[in-house]
Amino acid sequence: MTFPILILAAPTGAGKTSLITELDPTRFEILSFDSRQIYREMPIGTAAPTKEQQSKIRHHLVEVLSPKESIDAGLYNRMAEEALQKVLNTDKIPVFTAGTGFYLKAFLFGMFPVPEISVSVRERVLSMSIEEKKVLLNDLDPEALDKIFSGDDYRLGRALEVNLMGEKWSRLKIDPNTSAIYKYNLEIRLGIFLDLDRKELYERINLRAKRMIDLGMADEAWEIRERYGESCPGLKSLGYNFALENKKGNSNVETFLVDLSQSHRNYAKRQITWFRKENYIQAMDRSEALERIKHIK
């Protein structure tokens, strides 16, 4: 027996959350693959679904970790597997929503058998800029650097961690036994990439950034800093560095808006690059996506 699943991927600001709330809650439940929205206490800067939106359809893996906790593909896999089992037991169809494509792909198709990373190595890599990571990775494993998209800070960091633990990241092979598709006999009935005109997407992102600032993202960031420290993993999420700089008085609100908008546009560009090369999803607009989902059995 196979279990049908849906995949809904989209760049930040594309309207994925609002589309989700239009789905039939008696037929579907959401498994979120988003490395930012998994954190609690940070709803403004992560644009997490509101309580009202979550009440319309069951969400899993949203606002479940403390900002002081680290997240990686291995932990995400374990949490996602627990959530998937719950959904399959309801006879509903799981909808995998993705902003973080790497986590989704690792869960569905399998993970690399990476060594356990020591605290000292993880802290060292976290303290490095993306350019510093590239330089060191080029020295240790140039083949790995060639395989990783230059703007993918997460994968650069993970590859560097593996190499610093004494193994070549470029020589690792995916273990198919860790694939959820294989383990749970899943069938991708429909894979959607929510496609927007680039100009429209950037306008939406700019408006979202302004709304985040108006709602108090700087205060939210400062409260997290006071509670868990400035180096806590949650504050590594997109845009919080600019929020803290604003709160410290090192930038005005105009600069904050420019920097926040630009960082979100750059992130969206990287997401689009990632998802466009994945063959298990196809680009379509919102209306077509909703119509196709309605007819899934």
Swiss-Prot record:
Molecular function terms, GO-annotated: ATP binding; tRNA dimethylallyltransferase activity
Entry binding sites for substrate: 12-17
Upper taxonomic lineage: Bacteria, Pseudomonadati, Spirochaetota, Spirochaetia, Leptospirales
Span list, region Interaction with substrate tRNA: 34-37
The protein's role, per its UniProt record: Catalyzes the transfer of a dimethylallyl group onto the adenine at position 37 in tRNAs that read codons beginning with uridine, leading to the formation of N6-(dimethylallyl)adenosine (i(6)A).
Name recorded for this polypeptide: tRNA dimethylallyltransferase
HAMAP family to which the protein is assigned, alphabetical: IPP_trans
Subunit relationships: Monomer.
Cofactor(s) this protein cannot do without: Mg(2+)
NCBIfam families: miaA (TIGR00174)
Coiled coil: none
Family membership noted in the UniProt record: Belongs to the IPP transferase family.
Site (Interaction with substrate tRNA): 100
Amino acids binding ATP: 10-17
SUPFAM superfamilies from the UniProt entry: P-loop containing nucleoside triphosphate hydrolases
Gene: miaA
Keyword Endoplasmic reticulum: no
EC number from the UniProt entry: 2.5.1.75
Organism: Leptospira interrogans serogroup Icterohaemorrhagiae serovar Lai (strain 56601)
GO biological process, one term: tRNA modification
Catalyzed chemical reaction(s): adenosine(37) in tRNA + dimethylallyl diphosphate = N(6)-dimethylallyladenosine(37) in tRNA + diphosphate
Alphabetic keyword roster: ATP-binding, Magnesium, Nucleotide-binding, Transferase, tRNA processing
Enzyme class: transferase
Keyword Metal-binding among record annotations: no
